[in-house]
Amino acid sequence: MLKWTELAYDFYQQGYDVLLFDHRGQGYSQRIIPQKGHLDEFRFYIDDMAKIIEKTTALYSYQAQYILAHSLGALISTYYLANYDHHIKKAVLSSPFFGVPMKHPLRDEIIIATMMAFGQGHRYVFGKGHYKPADLNLNELSHSKTRMKWMNRVNRKRAAIHLGGPTFRWVHLCLNAIKALPKIIPRVEIPVLILQAEKEKIVDNKNLEKLTALFPHAESMLVPQAKHEILFEKDN
C-alpha cells in the first residue's frame, strides 16, 4: 500500500477519493507465514476485497466507483468483478497477473504438484527466499531509480512489510486461478482497459491477447519501454 502513496496523491489532487488496501500476506496485512508469499485459498483474496469495498460503499454514497488494479491485484479484481454484485463503472488492469512465467512449464508444474502432494506447499519455490532490497541497476520492476530507491528506504524503515518469494502453495493456487480465467473473464460486464508493459519479465503475457479478447468490453494499451511496475515507472 505504501508504494502507491504517490499515485494516490495524484488522484486525490484530481478530486478523487482513494481507497487502498494490502492483500492478506502483503504490506501491513497479517502474514500467514512470516516473510513468505503464502495463501490458504485463493478465494480469500476475493472475499477480502469484496468485504472492504462493501463496507466502504456503505459509509459513502459515491455516484461513481472505479478500480485501478496492478499485477496480482488485477487477477483478484477480475474475479471480484465477475463474481460479486458491485457498483464499479470501469476498471484499469495494469500488468495483470494472467500468466506465470516458466522456462519449462510441464516440468515446473510437475514439480509444483509433487511438492503439494508431499505436504511441502509452505516452502519457497526453488530459487526464492527472504526479502532482499531491489537492485537499483538490475531489476525487472522499474527503470525509475528514484522510486526504487525510495521503496528500498521505506522497506528498510518498516521491517513489518518485508515480503520474500512465493511458496509452492501460493503458485499452485494462482496457477489454478489463471487457468480458470477463460470461464471467469466473460462475466465481467463493465469496460476494462488493460495496460501491458513492453519490457515485462515478472508476469507471462503469452496469452494476454487471447484473454483480453474474452472480456465483453475491453481494450489494451502497450506502454513502450515500461517494465512490470507501469505505475511506478520513470517519468517521461
Language-model segment annotations:
Residues Y60-S71:
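Alpha/beta-hydrolase fold nucleophile elbow
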Residues A226-N236:
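Catalytic histidine-centered segment of alpha/beta-hydrolase-like enzymes
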Residues K201-N207:
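Conserved alpha/beta-hydrolase "acid-adjacent" motif
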Residues L72, I76-H162:
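Alpha/beta-hydrolase-fold enzymes
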Residues G165-I184:
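Active-site nucleophile elbow and catalytic-triad environment of alpha/beta-hydrolase enzymes
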Residues A8-P34:
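Conserved alpha/beta-hydrolase
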Residues V188, I194-Q196, E200:
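Short beta-strand/loop motif that positions the catalytic acidic residue
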